[in-house]
Amino acid sequence: MEKKNNKYTALLNVMKRELRRLVSRPLYLFCMVIAPLFCYIFFTTLMDSGLPTDMPVGVVDRDMTATSRQLVRNLDAFEQTAVVARYPDISDARIAMQKGEIYGFYYIPEGTADKAQAQRQPKVSFYTNNTLLIAGSLLFKDMKMMSELASGAAARTALYAKGATEEQAMAFLQPIVIDTHPLNNPWLNYSVYLCNTFAPGVLMLLIFMITVYSIGVEIKDRTAREWLRTSNGSIWISLAGKLLPHTAVFFLMGILYNTYLYGFLHFPCNSGILPMLLATLCLVLASQGMGILMIGTLPTLRLGLSFASLWGVLSFSMCGLSFPAMAMHPVLQGLANLFPLRHYFLIYADQALNGYPMIYSWMNYVALLVFMMLPFLVARRLKEALIHYKYLP
């Protein structure tokens, strides 16, 4: 019983020691509170309108007929497209696009209206700057749709001239009517799409960095032996006492972004907020386990921080947010499972978007549990480094 009390006393002593370190170094306040708050507000306000609107495009109208002017007016009527300039030729439009004045331009050659009326298949062209992926993709969609509508309008006029009724003409032009219903994010809101992963991703990256830093700086400042003595020589009490205050702060920041996204901004959360809070707690603990593995594998502050930053940044690409994992190379599909953010993203898709029961995500919860167990692999090596390693600047 006395031995058990000694363990609790040692744990409390390590926690008090760590709390003193947290309040004495502004770096902890910045990385654990200020930086996450800034990122939450920055990303959500950056994309507060959901989709970009009124993106500037140009027009090269060499036809100069009522038909071409109607085509330009219809293009300008799209929510995401704004016709801001007209150019005499393609060269001027290309130069404007290279300067960044417009994201694309629509080219209507001379004789387009006459060829359309004579059913000689006139050709229109459009060019988009796909260096900017979102702007280029959205404008490409609008310009392509405008071209298809113009083609349909010309064909409909020809059918009317041949005596077809409106019902007959529409049945010929569109024999199958498509009724589209996007699921889970029907507004196609980029903020919903990105912020639900950016917020936990940034938090995960900061947990990596702070976990590695808080242990590595003990080695750098040669206070590691004092830290171990405070825990009566137990590496597990040392780690628990050091990281429990971190866990509490980071989980509070996780509760904050969940409340902000699902309570204040009303992002889709079809299974309720409690499963997402559990997933957030699992992500925090898994990230801390991963951080211990990083500093245990490379017990040097600069190498450990490099490992943490590299792994954290790669997580945004490998989690399947920007590019679907199922479309990756099979080797990369396997490697994606080595990133905690990947499993959090899948839990988010199942719980918040689809509203499935938690049992459907059990494999991802188990994966996060495995990340929590990673310190068992490096505990002995880390203890030896704390006792014997000499920091070389």
Task: Label the model's feature ranges.
Residues 38-41, 181-261:
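Hydrophobic alpha-helical transmembrane segments of multi-pass membrane transport proteins
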